[in-house]
């Protein structure tokens, strides 16, 4: 949202016209706090089919919309998922990660929670790249037709792997297995 909003809108409109899924990440709480960035996000929102973020970004979005400060992450995700869309080819899905707490998925009026992989505090090395790794794992399963539970499991695996290493690095061989 901070750069090339015109390009984002062109891709968003094209995706809607071609009935392709358009995915966005909330990116950072400041996006919702800086008026030009928030305006760009809200212009894009009707085109977003999959929105991913973390609990801090979801709370910042809710605050920027004037929603009650005591809303749960599940309620925020549900409310965002029901916001108006430009196309009807698919429901909007909102996925919110919550660190050590379950990942929330809201779509079609339903909210589900998906467990993360437990990790002892002493195993936590570096959280940089965890959100990007989660999205990579999530999308890797969605593009091959897996359901939200399996996609979240892959996303949580990728994030869990990243946070146990310095920098955004992976082991030579993954240990993820498909359900």
In which residue ranges do the predicted regions lie?
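Conserved post-catalytic alpha-helical subdomain immediately downstream of the catalytic base
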Residues: 82-93, 100, 117-179
């Amino acid at each position: 949202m901070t750069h090339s909003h015109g390009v984002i809108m062109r891709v968003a409109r094209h995706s809607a016209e071609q009935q392709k899924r358009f995915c966005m990440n909330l990116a950072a709480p400041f996006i919702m706090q800086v008026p030009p960035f928030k305006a760009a996000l809200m212009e894009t929102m009707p085109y977003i089919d999959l929105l991913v973020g973390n609990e801090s970004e979801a709370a910042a979005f809710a605050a920027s919309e004037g929603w009650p400060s005591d809303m749960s992450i599940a309620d925020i995700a549900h409310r965002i998922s029901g916001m108006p869309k430009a196309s009807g080819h698919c429901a909007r899905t909102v996925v919110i990660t919550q660190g050590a707490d379950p990942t929330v998925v809201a779509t079609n009026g339903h909210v589900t929670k998906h467990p993360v992989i437990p990790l002892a505090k002493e195993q936590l090395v570096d959280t940089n790249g965890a959100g990007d790794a989660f999205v990579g794992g999530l999308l890797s399963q969605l593009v091959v037709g897996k359901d939200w539970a399996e996609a979240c499991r892959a996303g949580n695996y990728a994030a869990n792997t990243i946070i146990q290493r310095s920098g955004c690095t992976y082991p030579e061989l993954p240990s993820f297995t498909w359900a």
